[in-house]
Each structure stands twice: as C-alpha cells, then as structure tokens.
C-alpha cells in the first residue's frame, strides 16, 4: 500500500498550481471542458509520481501515515469542516440533490438510473449489507441531512433509529421532516464526535451505520473504540467511505493552490481501501466490498446538472450566505462537483472508488 503525508492530493486536481488559473476557473472564464482536462492532468501526474517510488519507500510512507493517524485526535478542524459543507442551509441541498437529500455516492447497477433511483438503490444496498431487520436499535453515525435516518425510520417502523450529527441546523431539519412524515421512531442527537459520548444506558446498538463520515476523521483507533462501546456485544458496524484502491493521504492546506482542502475538505483524509483494517483492536472485519468510481462520477455529474438547472433558486440563497461572493461560490460548488466526477471517473473508475465494510464488535475475553 502507499501513502503520502505532505504532497497535494488527487482531489486537489481542482487546484492548479498557478493561483491565477484558479481565479480564472472560479470566475467562470474557462469552459468546463478545460477545467476538467486540467483536473485529469493533475490526477495523472499524481499517480505517475506515486508509482515512481520503490516498494520500500511506499511501505514506509504508509506506516508513517498510520502512525500519524494514531497520534492524532479523533478529528481535527471540525468547525471548518462543518462550515464548509453546512454553512449553506438545507434549502440549498433541497434545490439540487435527489429527493432523499443523499449527500454521498449513489448506486447505479444498470448505469442509467436517475439520481432518485440511485439514492434508493444505495440505501437498499446498505440495508442488505448491514443485515438490517425491523425491531433493531440502529445508530446513523454522521447522519447529514437525514437521508439514511429517515429512510430507516420509514422502512423499519418497529426499529429505534438514532441519528448523530454535529449540526443543530441538520437536527432541526431532520426533526421537521420526521414530523411531517409522521415518524415517531427517530431521534436526532447533536455533538462533536471528539468529545461526544452516549450515556451508558443509551448504548447497546444492534447496528451502527456510517456513511462518508470516516473521511472527516483522523484517529480511527480511538473512533472505532468509541463506536464499539456503543454497540451491543452482537452488534455490527457498517461503514461506507470513498477511497483510493492503494493510496492514503491527508487533505492539507499548505498554500493557496490547495483548493479542495481549503474550501471543501479541511482536515480530511483520503483512505486507501485497506486503511481501516489497520485499526481492529475493538472491531473485526467480517465482509468488505468495492464499488468502482463510476458510481460516484455519475452521482456528481447529476448533482452538477441539477445545480445548474436550479441556479435561479440557488443564487438568492448564496447571496444571503456569501454576499458579494455569491457568484464565485456558485462556481466553486460547480468545480467541486466536477472535481468529484473527474476524480472518481478517472481511468473508468479503476483508481478511486467506494469501499463498504461490515465489522463485528470484538469480544473481550474473560
């Protein structure tokens, strides 16, 4: 496996080295096809640089990254990360995401699904792979705008669903949706995962599901230990992350050209497909799956098309949030979706993709 701890990430492919070019992109002076071509060029260079290393150097870099994660807090830059994606209100996401407001990869088994169909297909895939049943006590760890929590509450009326978010705005949004739909088996709690812990009387979850949350984390050992404490002895943890098949790296802001890290992923981590397997003191892997990157590329391209169509609805929202920079931020969100599409679509989806894991709680021997 390989890792880099100081070089720019491939997702920074939306960040050309020249700050002037970035300004041109952000102001919409360059056509999308040229912006996308620049992204692909930087991804290609990144992979070329990585594969130039010998095996010994790659292994050493990977071990260094694992040690760095183990010496870190559970998460860093939590305020910045929350602000970057959620300073805009739920109405922005309602304007252009699918009807479930799933702000993560969809599933396209045929390849021609609509965004709505891809949302439903992925949610159903979670239920299958996590081995969900009605009547279980289920935690949605990092519940976002409630796509999974609300879906679970609808599908499993006898289950007790708890969603954990670090955003009070998200909690109020989900609670309002639950009330409108007459759902009484869903509870949302808020807290920063670094400090948050459930009361022991409120633990014992049969299932914990986490969708594109671990990428915002650092110390996976501490995180998994905390989650394991929340689980029933026979409980299972299902994790969905985006990943590279081999590379693992930090999203870091070192200069103005670290565009993705600066505006959308401060403090984040790009895991490799097997990175979580290095942290099994408190959980044990039961199953692992891989979805190629074309699923996320389709998702992001559909988000982009929907965002463009919703521009008249979105711009007043952005003018309230971003003020005089509303037009620039509209283009930044477009570039973000283009970067996601190009990253996961690179090499027909055979470099970056989506990993699913099913973990058992590791039993403590008497």
Tell me the role of every PLM-derived stretch.
Residues 135-144:
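Conserved class I S-adenosyl-L-methionine
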Residues 221-233:
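A short glycine-rich, Lys/Arg-flanked "PGG" loop and its adjoining helix->strand segment in the class I
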Residues 181-195:
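Conserved SAM-binding strand-loop segment of SAM-dependent methyltransferases
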Residues 145-157:
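Conserved SAM-binding loop of SAM-dependent methyltransferases across substrates and taxa
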Residues 46-129:
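Conserved Class I S-adenosyl-L-methionine-dependent methyltransferase catalytic core
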Residues 195-208:
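A short acidic, Gly/Pro-enriched loop at the edge of an enzyme's catalytic core
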Residues 234-242:
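Conserved beta-strand signature within the Rossmann-like core of class I S-adenosyl-L-methionine
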Residues 243, 249-351, 360-364:
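Substrate-binding/catalytic lobe of Class I Rossmann-like enzymes that use SAM or dcSAM, i.e.
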């Amino acid at each position: 496996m390989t890792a880099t701890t100081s070089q720019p990430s491939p997702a920074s492919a939306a960040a050309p080295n020249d700050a002037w070019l970035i300004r041109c992109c952000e102001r919409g002076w360059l056509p999308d096809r040229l912006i996308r071509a620049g992204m692909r060029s930087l991804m290609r260079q990144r992979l070329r640089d990585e594969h130039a290393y010998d095996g010994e150097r790659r292994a050493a870099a990977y071990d260094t990254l694992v040690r760095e994660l183990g010496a870190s807090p559970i998460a860093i830059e939590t305020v910045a990360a929350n602000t970057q994606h959620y300073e805009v209100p739920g109405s922005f996401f309602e304007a252009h995401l699918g009807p479930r407001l799933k702000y993560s990869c969809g599933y396209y088994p045929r390849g021609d699904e609509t965004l709505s169909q891809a949302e439903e297909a992925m949610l159903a895939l979670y239920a299958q792979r996590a081995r969900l049943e009605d009547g279980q006590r289920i935690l949605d760890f990092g519940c976002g705008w409630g796509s999974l929590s609300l879906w679970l509450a609808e599908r499993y009326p006898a289950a007790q669903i708890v969603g954990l978010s670090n955003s009070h705005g998200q909690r109020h949004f989900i609670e309002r949706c639950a009330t409108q739909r007459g759902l009484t088996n869903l509870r949302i709690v808020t807290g920063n995962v670094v400090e948050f812990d459930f009361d022991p009387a409120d633990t014992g979850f049969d299932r914990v599901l986490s969708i594109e949350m671990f990428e915002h984390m650092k110390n996976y050992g501490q995180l998994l230990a905390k989650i394991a404490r929340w689980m029933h002895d026979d409980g299972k943890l299902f994790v969905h992350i985006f990943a590279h098949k081999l590379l693992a790296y930090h999203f870091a802001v070192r200069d103005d050209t670290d565009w993705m890290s600066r505006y959308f992923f401060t403090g984040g981590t790009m895991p490799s497909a097997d990175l979580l397997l290095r942290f099994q003191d408190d959980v044990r892997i039961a199953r692992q799956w891989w979805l190629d990157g074309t699923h996320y590329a389709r998702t992001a391209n559909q988000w982009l098309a929907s965002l463009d169509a919703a521009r008249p609805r979105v711009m007043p929202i952005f003018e309230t949030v971003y003020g005089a920079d509303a037009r620039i931020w509209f283009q930044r969100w477009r570039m973000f979706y283009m970067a996601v599409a190009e990253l996961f679509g690179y090499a027909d989806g055979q470099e970056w993709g989506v990993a699913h894991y099913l973990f058992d709680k590791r039993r403590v021997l008497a």
